[in-house]
């Protein structure tokens, strides 16, 4: 009963916050190129490969999702280039057992899940906003339990015919100053894409 009441209050607060935000101007309809479906499929495949690489500790596959000069930002800081990205994620992975472990103290088995993604493609550049969550067998009796969740802010570029991350910013709703904030992330993505495309004309 108490949980139900808390959820209702949380939802009411979220609705009140949303209602208090200024209404953005109506966004122009996004125009999709004839190749959008193919580009989107390749980008979604890249996102999936990124997550499989994390969960199975395949760091060669992980860094291969980034351009040579790619950038990764997450709770541990900002890393640029394959070597720095590899060091950042392997160091983080070694310490994950402190946060997620089974009843007998062993490191829990983590699985990352990507939810909906909005993807904008303009020529050889793309932007994406996705929601993600992380589960592990660290619940009571080693049952699966959601550990955390957040959003991915991605900038991508086509390199030698393949889509790669130029920059990935991992936002986590449980970490102060690393959450997504109240504004619609897709609207922000569209505005960023419009600035870049407009600047090239």
PLM region spans:
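C-terminal segment of classical bacterial N-terminal signal peptides
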Residues: 15-24
